[in-house]
Amino acid sequence: MATQDSQGIKLFGKTIAFNTRTIKNEEETHPPEQEATIAVRSSSSSDLTAEKRPDKIIACPRCKSMETKFCYFNNYNVNQPRHFCKGCHRYWTAGGALRNVPVGAGRRKSKPPGRVVVGMLGDGNGVRQVELINGLLVEEWQHAAAAAHGSFRHDFPMKRLRCYSDGQSC
């Protein structure tokens, strides 16, 4: 294992000397402006990829828009950074093949709208209110007139129907 001598640490057959005195002297001689550059030089290799980040904006190969942003480096090939085009909402890699990807692929979908009142309808038996809640059509019936005629009254006042986008009745 490792043993400690007055000269340094012996590890795997090699002696590592202590240089704490020389490091402290070097830190004292550096002005504060150079401390930031020393910290950058001593950073890990993951920070080096951030330094390689492209500075110039590259036009989108599909729509030729200059509204692109750098996303990250490709995991398989660091020489092909991944970009995102704000114009056509597609990802692309510089130097990579253009794939036939639909617009907005891989992006998060927006939340559906909240509760929206579609309309208020009336008929002979009672008042019918139609509302749209998260893509479902909901009908509320007030059964005052239906109960007065002696007909069967439902215990559940709300009735759910599927609403289709092609305009057919629900």
From Swiss-Prot:
Function: Transcription factor that binds specifically to a 5'-AA[AG]G-3' consensus core sequence. Transcriptional repressor of 'CONSTANS' expression. Regulates a photoperiodic flowering response.
Induction statement: Circadian-regulation. The transcript level rises progressively from dawn and decreases during the night.
Signal peptide region: none
Alphabetized UniProt keyword annotations: DNA-binding, Flowering, Metal-binding, Nucleus, Transcription, Transcription regulation, Zinc, Zinc-finger
Chief location of this protein within or outside the cell: nucleus
Zinc finger (Dof-type): 58-112
Pfam families listed in its UniProt record: Zn_ribbon_Dof (PF02701)
Keyword Transport: no
Gene Ontology BP term (one): negative regulation of stem cell population maintenance
Tissue: Expressed in the vasculature of cotyledons and hypocotyls, leaves and roots.
Record's subcellular location: Nucleus
Region feature Disordered, mapped onto this chain: 25-51
Keyword Cell cycle: no
Binding, Zn(2+): 60, 63, 85, 88
GO cellular component: nucleus
Protein name, as recorded: Cyclic dof factor 4
A single GO molecular function term of this UniProt record: zinc ion binding
